[in-house]
Design a protein with these regions (language model features):
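Catalytic domains of riboflavin
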Residues: 1-228
Length: 228
């Protein structure tokens, strides 16, 4: 049965899990617990589309259903009952870095290093935000900003050239998931971004200690990181 995490505005997040996820971390095998998380407003759309798909067996409905299945994830490492001050990473999705291994950013190394650091520390969470691609502008717009950056603009200038905000990420769901999984316990947040700490705090998350998380720096992304 899915659990539920409340979200400001009267919504709730359906949390499906735990689902054992075997990973190799710190040169050892671990069964990390994976939870899939989706707002009930989105879950309702998924259920409606699934009913339509069963009735019509239409490829169009199948494609639309898949588009709504990009849900957030929580990876739980260790036993939450034993946590006193766990390590946490709230990670924004980055297809090019996390999946393709692109060195235009440091996202892939940051994600993998976070999992290792959380394991070494005895446990914690990685919250993976699926809707944060390109700091919230989406993959297509991100591709366009890359072309502008190759023409000399930095990561923020390229957003502005497209009429897009520098950072449009919404951390309300991340905050709700942190409160659901950690409760009121203090925790250490792996991030180089003080704004992320402030955004989570504005959504009611307390007890945060920021821990720097510098990794993945290369000649390919030095200009990008300098702008950040």
């Amino acid at each position: 049965e899915p659990g539920h995490a409340p979200v400001p505005g009267g919504h709730t997040i359906s949390v499906l899990g735990p689902i054992p996820m075997p990973l190799t971390l710190c040169e050892s095998n671990f069964d990390v617990q994976w939870y899939a998380c989706v707002r009930n407003t989105e879950l309702g759309k998924i259920q409606e589309l699934a009913d339509d798909l069963r009735a019509q067996e239409g490829q169009r409905s199948c494609a639309t259903l898949a588009s709504y299945m990009a849900v957030n994830s929580v990876m739980v490492i260790g036993d939450p009952e034993s946590w006193e001050n766990p390590l946490v990473r709230v990670h924004s999705s980055c297809l090019t870095g996390d999946v393709f291994g692109s060195q235009r950013c440091e996202c892939g190394p940051q994600m993998h290093a976070a999992l290792e650091r959380i394991t070494e520390a005895g446990g914690g969470l990685l919250v993976y935000m699926a809707g944060h691609e390109g700091r919230g502008i989406g993959l297509w717009a991100k591709a366009a900003t890359y072309l502008l950056q190759d023409g000399g603009e930095d990561t923020y200038q390229s957003n502005e050239s497209l009429g897009l905000p520098a950072d449009s990420r919404d951390f309300s769901d991340a905050a709700s998931l942190l409160k659901h999984f950690i409760g009121g316990k203090p925790f250490r947040l792996l991030t180089n971004n003080p704004k992320k700490v402030n955004d989570l705090g504005e959504h009611g998350v307390t007890g945060i200690t920021r821990v720097k998380h510098v990794t993945g720096v290369s000649d390919c992304n030095r200009r990008y990181l300098s702008a950040k």
